[in-house]
Amino acid sequence: RSKITDVDRKAINEESEEFYKVITATKESFDQLKDAKKSLDLSRKIIEMQEDTLQKDLKKQMKEISSSLDSLSNLFMDPEGLKGIQRNPNTLNNRLWTARRYLGSSWTIPGQNAMKAVTNAREEAEETIKAVNEFIQVDYLLFQETINGLRVKIFKEMQPVKIE
C-alpha cells in the first residue's frame, strides 16, 4: 500500500481544479448551443406569421442554422434518442470523462497517462469551443440580426365574420 502525502494531495487538487476550468468552459459553450436552439424554436413561431415570400427564405436559413446546431451538439455528445448503450469515443463528453477517471484513479501525483488524457481532453475542448464561438459570432449572429430586423407580426389580420 502506498502512502499518500501532502504533496500528492496538493498535486491532485491543482490538476483537478485546472481540469474543472475546462469542464466549466465546455458546459458554458454547450449551454450557448442549447439557448440558440430555444431561440430558433421561438423564431420558427414568429416566422409562421410572416408573408409567404419572406417565410420561404427564412425557413431555408433556419434549416441551415438548425443543421449547424445539431452538428456542433454532436461534437459534445451523441444525439438524443439513440437506443441501447452507446459508447462513442469521439465525443468531447467521453474525452472529458476519460480524463476525469484518470485524474481520480490514483492517490498519488497524476502520472503520464492521466496527464495525456487531460491534455487530449483540453485540446478537444478548445477545438470544439472555438467551433461553437465561430458559429455563434458569425452565422448565428447574422441570422439573429435578420430575425431582429423583422417587422414582427404576432397577430394575423382578422376581419369580422358575417353570414351573407
Regions found by a protein language model. Give the residues of each.
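Low-complexity, Pro/Ser/Thr- and charge-rich linker/hinge segments at domain boundaries
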Residues: 1-21
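Mature extracytoplasmic or organellar-lumen-exposed domains after removal of signal/transit peptides
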Residues: 18-164
